[in-house]
Amino acid sequence: MPIAIRCLAAFAFAVSPITSVPAQPPGPQVDLGINADLKGWRLLPNDSPWHRDISGDPVDPNSERILARIGWHKPLHPDFGTEHEGAPIGIPYIVVSGNQPRVRVTFTEAPQESDPGPYPIPRDAPIEGGPNGKGDRHVLVLDRDAWMLYELFNAFPDGKGGWRAGSGAIWNLKKNQERPPRWTSADAAGLPILPGLVRYDEVVGAGKVEHAIRFTLVKTRRAYIPPASHWASKAFDDDLPPMGMRMRLKADYDLSSFSPEAQVVLQALKTYGMMLADNGSDNFITGAPDPRWDMAALRQLRRVTTKDFEVVDMAGMVADQPRR
């Protein structure tokens, strides 16, 4: 989606510490509402793969071939921001309390790989792309009291107080979870979505992003690397990227000329990388919408291209084999 450019007033970062996931959920310490401030709480345990520092991981032997297939000069694209043509840019989420009523969800595309629920989805839960969106229509709900995450793909209100969706997954954020092998989630790779989003409260509020960032590519392989659990491709080429693949911004890439916001994102890409989660436009990194984003600052990320990355070691990859 093309991004409308809006210049907002400059601001100073107020850096606050990132807090580990507690033994008990944070509850009222986290705000309620759409795209709410998580007050520095990590969504997943400290030892989650999403929080793993990959800056010292070896480069995969197939890195250059994979990057060439993507296209050396394809730009990084921030697929989040303020709004475009009346719809928020990015994947929104909503934080609810533990007493949010649960409703029925009917699954229409992958019911056998979806968690049946019920799900605590408010009637006014934001939908990716807006109520009339034509894209993936993700719905993400975080229960702050149970520290549980509920996610839907291709979600529509059913007119009876419930929802219908293509697929859905429920995540207990107090521990590390993976979907069963070859199961999808609300994302093609079988991963949770919210933990990989770039959020305003991280970039501006905390001044740091301490997790891998979700991203998409046009062409992928029938393969995945855990914690991913699912592929969404008909191609077997070994120089195509598998789901769950991580690309890392090169350590010597100079960040000094970028805006403070862009530097936060790029430093995360050096430390934690970006994790391939879905088929989509090349090098699109995903975040949550917020009217306070400085679009001119985010647009600077487009100066980075595929050639500035490297694919980290893909040990543990699960690959399908063509039938003979």
Where are each of the predicted segments found?
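N-terminal secretory signal peptides that target proteins for export/translocation
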Residues: 1-3
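Short, surface-exposed polybasic-aromatic patches that bind anionic ligands, especially phosphate groups
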Residues: 24-324
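Sec/Tat signal peptide C-region and signal peptidase I cleavage site
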Residues: 19-22
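Bacterial N-terminal signal peptides
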Residues: 6-17
